[in-house]
Amino acid sequence: MEACCCSSSSVPSASILATGAGLRRRFSPAGAGGGGRAVAVAAGRPIRASAALLAAPAPRRRGGVVVRAVFERFTERAVKAVVFSQREARGMGDETVAPHHLLLGLVAEDRSPLGFLASGVRVERAREACRAAVGKEGLAQAPVGLATDVPFSGASKRVFEAAVEFSRNMGCNFISPEHIALGLFNLNDPTTNNVLKSLGVDSSQLAKQALTRVQGELAKDGREPVGLSSFKVREKFTPGGGKSAIVKYSNKNKEKSALALFCLDLTMRASGGLIDPVIGRKDEIERVVQIICRRTKNNPILLGEAGVGKTAIAEGLAHKIANGDVPIFLVGKRILSLDVALLMAGAKERGELEARVTSLIREVRKAGDVILFIDEVHTLIGSGIAGRGSKGAGLDIANLLKPALARGELQCIASTTLDEHRLHFDKDKALARRFQPVLVNEPSQEDAVKILLGLREKYETYHKCKYTLESINAAVYLSARYIADRHLPDKAIDLIDEAGSRARMESFKRKKEEQCSILSKSPDEYWQEIRAVQNMHEVALTNKVKYSLNQNDQEDAVDIELVGEDKTSPASMLSTSTDKPSLVGSEEIARVTSLWSGIPVQQLTADERKLLVGLDDELRKRVIGQDDAVLAISKAVKRSRVGLNDPDRPIATLIFCGPTGVGKTELTKALAASYFGSESATVRLDMSEYMERHAVSKLIGSPPGYMGFGEGGTLTEAVRRKPFTVVLLDEIEKAHPDIFNILLQIFEDGHLTDSQGRRVSFKNTLIVMTSNVGSTSISNGKRSIGFQTQTDTEEKSYAAMKSLVMEELKAFFRPELLNRIDEVVVFHPLEKTQMLAILNIMLQEVKGRILALGIGLEVSDSMKDLISQHGYDKSYGARPLRRAVTQLVEDVISEAILSGQFKPGDTIMVDTDATGKPCLSRLNDQTVQLSDPTPTL
């Protein structure tokens, strides 16, 4: 008979949530008819969780009170509890939802195993107690109409108002059933108290449990419950003998002001020594003080690139104020740094952010001694508009600050970069005129050294190390030369910081290794060290006793040695050696610079010095017959590695001229493999891909409005990511002439600006261009140079050939391009004797590929002569030789392997038969050791 009454299991949660969602849509402010007119909502509709929860009663409908609100902040559980209470009221035949109905709804919603708020009370038992309290024992009445049409009584309204107030004081952005329960217990309703008394439940214990649950919900979200400790629960005895819980909110501590919440006092931190000292910048700080002392528009804005020290100027002024080294009208001022992110965080309701800003302005005006420092001030422009509705709502923070800034009521020091200032402030002239610009330039290297010397003590204390003067100078010099995309002093400070961190890590590793070495020693070795140390100290003690002036001195010396004997044990010696601060020198700074930039700037090791000395011979192993080119490129690398090259230009700019197939590109690959570690270290651009005029944009990036804008250029992006590399511009004469205009500033100044406005440094690149200009003259040899005789030396012949090639280069390239090239290297045509050496290199590559299949390869001399005969062409260089190797060796071997003539472990002998054709045979006396006997075929 009580089917109409609600229980926790009788109503599906999905239908209840659908009811709540429908109520939200139906009675939201946007959907209210009449453009915001008060809408008469059915009495049983869910209510809005706000401070103005219940408005004045509207005309009655079905004998109830009309509620104008929606469930904007009610949780799903709170919606369920309200709907359950309405159905309980309908089941009991009541016309309104009274507080005891709310109690039944809360009990029905709480499905925990321990019952309602861990009291063990279930909904069936609570329903019986409630009927007995109101004198309606017996069968339930048949429901008439919808359960959600039941209105709320005035007492229930006060419960909801109290729940909203509890939620606000607790710092919650939601209203849960626990908040409703606290409001219910705080109401002191007689019927509710009688129900709880009959159930044998203490309301004060229930209130404490509700507070605990709220705290747990906030902890799950990682939030600190604001003001939760200010709630006190006490018991109050009712006239009928019952008890009710009174939950009081006592906020004795004064609420934090907006300045305390959103600002950081730089002056106080400077007084406590929590801010690094500011070295230099005297002129900039003086200019800032002059602007601050103006009557109106006394707001300086610091403009400069990232890392030049804009924030340090504000901190320097805070130091001066803390030390009293300012004019009399600035004494007692405070510089507060505004945290814009903290100011905006959590302001999701309309008007909340504006209220914070106006409160901040009001407190600054009231204090009278506050100077706000807003770092990255461009973030204020547009803040507060984005993300608020379809078209945005609320005022811009910058617009809120304009009146106070113009009248001088709000003093502000702002900072931003030049690019951000141009992007944001140039569009808002009204805001820009309220700030007076102070340009902060990058300090010179001398000033940067002074700054680092002033900061050295701070970093030495933190990293437990010592910085030498050479390390400070090296940090400034190396960062200025090899880290081009950052600015001083920021990049130099980062170098010493990371070098100190590295030194501390190395010290820890050494300590662990020494400890492990002591533990790994045998007992005999350990005691031998102890006896050796004891013998040394006995000798020292004997000498002190022997040369003491009197007996008392002897006794003192003995006592001193005996007391200090424990300090000479191996363990104490280990701790003493490891506690000694590490020394950071220029080599450590150079090593960090190399790790950072990818450029080897540390001192030459023995292996690297040996590699550089033998670089010529290493390159000649791969490039045959081009000694002049090998010498030119190796000299450039050696000059750069020692540090004698011009720091404002690339390592070298070379152009290789010669006929096709003589090794121009191969020499560049050989250099990358020998010194740079891999052939992939080469940035190769085939200039035949840049034959059109519009293809110039491929190098530096597409301009705005074109596809690919923002992706960067092929050349600039490759060098920006890998500054220490070889740039190969292959077949340069095939590119469009406009390409040469791009290359001019690279060759001369060592930098190039891409489409994004970023300057890319080419100062650590080796630029090589290959060209076939003059190849015809080189191939013709003496026939082209008619004045030569048989008695001419090789040097004269090469010089004459080079001069002839230069004439053709001057006819093809512009003078301003040729004038920026360091050296023009002319490659010799390959002779037949040189072809045999090149053939051996090619056959070694073929052997390596066949060996991967588990098969060896040998080639006879007669076969080599046959390949050289077929592959030699003076006009085409070594490329015909490669084709001959493919046709006479690789094709024949591949056919034999596929036909099953050879298997893994065999060695193939390639020879010529009686007719002079290639033939294959198996060498049985030679085997190949296989790592994997399964062939890859």
From Swiss-Prot:
ATP binds at residues 304-311, 658-665. Highly expressed in stems, culms and leaves. One of its GO terms (molecular function) is ATP binding. Residues 1-80 form a transit peptide. InterPro entries: AAA+_ATPase (IPR003593), ATPase_AAA_core (IPR003959), Clp_ATPase_C (IPR019489), Clp_N_dom_sf (IPR036628), Clp_R_dom (IPR004176), ClpA/B (IPR001270), ClpA/B_CS1 (IPR018368), ClpA/B_CS2 (IPR028299). Residues 81-217 form the Clp R domain. Keywords: ATP-binding, Chaperone, Chloroplast, Nucleotide-binding, Plastid, Repeat, Transit peptide. One of its GO terms (cellular component) is chloroplast. Residues 584-775 are annotated as: II. Residues 81-137 are annotated as: Repeat 1. Belongs to the ClpA/ClpB family. ClpD subfamily. This is Chaperone protein ClpD2, chloroplastic. It comes from Oryza sativa subsp. japonica (Rice). The gene is CLPD2.
